[in-house]
Amino acid sequence: MKKKLVSFGMAAMMAASLAACGGSKPAETTAAAGDAETTAAAEGAETEAAAEGGTLKVGVIGPLTGAGAAYGNAVANGAELAAKEINEAGGINGMMIETKAEDDENDPEKSINAYNTLKDWGMQVLDGPTTSKPCIAVGAEAESDNMFLITPSGSAVECVATDNAFRVCFADPDQGTASAKYIGENKLATKIAIIYDSSTEYSSGIREAFVAEAANQGLEIVADEAFTADSNTDFSVQLDKAKDAGAELVFLPIYYQEASIILKQAHDKEFAPIFFGCDGMDGILSVTNFDTSLAEGLMLLTPFSTTEESSKAFTEAYVAAYGIEPNQFAADSYDAIYAIKAAVEQAGVTADMSASDICDALKPAMTEISIDGLTGTGMVWNANGEPNKAPKAVKIVNGEYEMQ
């Protein structure tokens, strides 16, 4: 059964919650930095528990190599860390979680190959794919197989078009709408330029929704400039048009790699508007050889920040395990595993069930659970696979995120 490709309710919720998101109840996490090293006793307990309750096999798909490797590895790490935590606490009613990540290099065809490899491994539930185009491609296969799919970060509307698919992140239209509302309601600027990647569903989808809501907010789009994956190193033309048009704010619904180049080139042109991004901007402070002072004052909407008290334990555990600070993709995947755990408990799933039977059990269970995660408190899902949670606005101040 196909779902309706709509997200109006989510967009309305996000808009209503933006003003109050800074005061929301902290999300709960059970991560602890001291758990980074598993003791022999704990490993023995896990083995014994797995023998008694069995193992739930969760596949993970994302770009582990190539330009998008930062995202795919974060998703794989977030899933692994959550599974380790759950297993050390006794699993899911004694059932252990085993994760296995496969590389899709951010390529739809290779993502299908990764999916088939995980099926051969015995995958029963899928956490992924990480990015939208591969997620859409794999989604068709997962629907045919009746495989339960929860994508941590596939934000295109089509990623959850079928009734077996759910997501943790916000959908693209919701991010665009919420960004325009935030800019308008907080009177950040009136003259707006947009620089977006027309070759990706992510950037194009956010941009389209932003433009529609900007009109409602009385924002004037003075420049609307595109680039593609084949022309993402020189942004002189786009920046010149934005500067000449008197843009007070430049909206960047793009990933942080290109954003870091734009910030450097804008600085060289002595063009200093407010720069505003979405969740794909998360990670800009970790770009190799990037002068992070150029990101000072940059704003973005994201449901996760490592500087929040509620994220501290997870961040410490992640750094101890992987030697790098987590980004939103890691947090999304971590929450995806805990959503699977809650739904499995709700549905009474056991390890000896087939992937199809597990999918049939989890679909209704997902609409009955609520979790306090890293990316939202009291998160719930509707039958269209969309999460209900509040975004958060952050600003980079002195090289760190500061909640707004």
PLM region descriptions:
Residues 1-10:
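Positively charged n-region of N-terminal signal peptides that target proteins for export
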Residues 17-20:
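C-terminal motif of bacterial Sec signal peptides marking the signal peptidase cleavage site
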Residues 22-25:
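Bacterial signal peptide processing site
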Residues 27-32, 36-404:
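Extracytosolic ligand-binding ectodomains
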